[in-house]
Regions:
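N-terminal Rossmann-like dinucleotide-binding module
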Residues: 1-29, 151
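Beta-loop-alpha module in the N-terminal Rossmann-like domain of NAD(P)-dependent dehydrogenases
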Residues: 18, 29-87
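A short helix->loop->beta-strand "cap" motif at the edges of active sites that frequently abuts
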Residues: 31, 66-68, 92-96, 187
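Hydrophobic residues in well-ordered beta-strands that form the structural core
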Residues: 35, 72, 97-99, 215
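C-terminal helix-rich "cap/oligomerization" subdomain common to oxidoreductases
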Residues: 46-49, 95, 184, 266-301
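A contiguous active-site-proximal alpha/beta segment in oxidoreductase catalytic domains
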Residues: 77-134
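Mid-domain beta-loop-alpha active-site segment that forms a flexible
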Residues: 100-107, 130-161, 174, 283-284
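Contiguous beta-strand/loop segments that form the cofactor/metal-binding neighborhood of enzyme cores
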Residues: 148-223, 254-257, 261-274
């Protein structure tokens, strides 16, 4: 739908294993349906893969072999070997691969990184109602992967230690996971993801030496709390005071945008103008490696 709204794309059609579903999409958006993926790939120079995670590798490799720039919805792949093979094939053919970590295009996060933050501690919470559609992978690859990606972009340092706990409740994989990442520069991140929540929540809290930022990625709002050294100069926004220090609160305004449109537009700009890809295959692999390490820690427990 968002690709149809973008003048950089000429949507040639859609492929779906389910012919009934494919016909419905074809009718709804007035695009051609292809029951043979090769016929569609022969008409394209770029593809968007929004299929179950277990199929990403096979479809992406086929697209690259047909000389198509490739957008792959998260998670990149279900194992590292496949992700590396996709990266290698794309590089050999001089093709672009973008991974669908959509929160990079969330206007709240984009606004936040404009402050050039220097985190010392981060905490993420990503809660969602149960959805059968995502249970081919655990909650780490389904939900937490977004926050791993965001945190790695905020703390571009190697991780020295990972610990994790999780539970399986409805599905055959982990539905609730908490992970702790300790970086070599002594920054720590605490991540929680659950797909068993009544209400959705996507929050990121970032603590710096003198600033605390609370990002609501779901409701597109942000508040920043700043430590002031002279409490006598406070204003009505002060929320705490102690001796000569105070903490003031400021709400940061954010303009709502369609993150999915922005994500696909960025993909098109990278193809047309060779604009750097925000989440390329290399970054996608780095995020996957941490996700799989969290899985490993859970299995050890």
């Amino acid at each position: 739908e968002q690709a149809l709204k973008n003048e950089n794309f000429n949507v040639r059609g859609v492929y779906d294993l389910n012919e009934i579903r494919g016909a419905e999409i074809s009718k709804k958006y007035n695009v051609d349906y292809f029951s043979d993926i090769n016929q569609l790939l022969n008409k394209c120079n770029a593809v968007s893969i929004v299929t179950p995670a277990s199929t990403h590798y096979e479809i992406a490799l086929k697209a690259l072999e047909n000389n198509c720039h490739t957008f792959i919805e998260k998670p990149f792949c279900t194992n590292i070997k496949h992700a590396h093979e996709i990266q290698k094939t794309a590089e050999e053919k001089n093709l672009l691969v973008q991974i669908g970590h959509i929160e990079q295009f969330n206007p709240v996060f984009k606004k936040f990184i404009s402050f050039n933050p220097k985190p010392v501690f981060l905490e993420s919470e990503r809660l969602a109602p149960f959805n059968k559609r995502g249970i081919d992978v655990d909650v780490i690859l389904d939900l937490m992967i977004h926050d791993i990606d965001l945190i790695l972009s905020l703390v571009p340092t190697k991780i020295k230690n990972i610990s994790a706990n999780g539970v399986q409740i409805l599905s055959n994989s982990y539905d609730l996971v908490n992970a702790r990442l300790e970086f070599q520069n002594n920054v720590t991140a605490n991540l929680t993801a659950s797909r068993l929540s009544i209400q959705p929540m996507r929050k990121l809290r970032v603590f710096e030496s003198n600033v605390y930022s609370s990002l609501d990625l779901n409701n597109l709002s942000m508040a920043r709390y700043t430590v002031n050294q002279n409490s006598k100069n406070h204003n009505e926004n002060v929320v705490f005071e102690l001796d000569d220090k105070s903490v003031s609160r400021k709400t940061v305004s954010v303009n709502a945008i369609n993150a999915l449109y922005e994500e696909l537009d960025s993909f098109s700009q990278s193809i047309i103008n060779r604009k750097p890809i925000i989440v390329d295959a290399k970054k996608g692999i780095q995020t996957l490696e941490i996700a799989f390490e969290i899985q490993k820690k859970l299995n050890e427990n």
